[in-house]
């Protein structure tokens, strides 16, 4: 449950900038919402000493509700359009966009939930999730400042809190972020990517998250269909530990 440190530091820092940067409000909403889901899972698992916390369906329902509220905000506020910026074609104002129309709604769900669970899968090896998330959040901070997007305070807060956390999370780890940290961070990265129009580059910058997720999908799919495991253990970072 060490992720409470990251979440608390990020939220408190961001609150100082809400008046001047109102765009960080929806990011805080999703980050805290996903963090609460993770906290409940960790509390049931550790605090109540249960073998498992929330089951996958319960987590997914919570994630769907929070993402749905955020998506409704996007579509009604006009904060962003229904297009995705094609990488390396320009910035917000002069870049080329892939207009998805109504498909933008399921795309947002896919991006946010995919990122959230990808970060969650990556957590489990000392310093791995923290270091990769620092790289992605730093990239987003540079973009946020360069595009004057109005969300740089929260991206910077994420980087700062993670740098402090990493000191105690590298091998041998003294503190672990748990689901409260990984789900909060995953939700934040997904939402930030949408608001910055960097959905495509998220796949590149967060390549480790993609690989971890695909390893779980392949492992589960292979076992269900053929009764055989591809990896000794999934997500894939556990395969290389054994």
Language-model region placement:
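Membrane interface segments of multi-pass transport proteins and intramembrane proteases
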Residues: 45-55, 86-98
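Alpha-helical transmembrane segments
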Residues: 6-39, 70-77, 82-84, 88, ...
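Hydrophobic alpha-helical transmembrane segments
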Residues: 36, 60-69
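Membrane-interfacial loop-to-helix junctions in multi-pass inner-membrane proteins
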Residues: 20-26, 47-62
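Select subsegments of transmembrane alpha-helices in polytopic membrane proteins
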Residues: 1-6, 58-63, 130
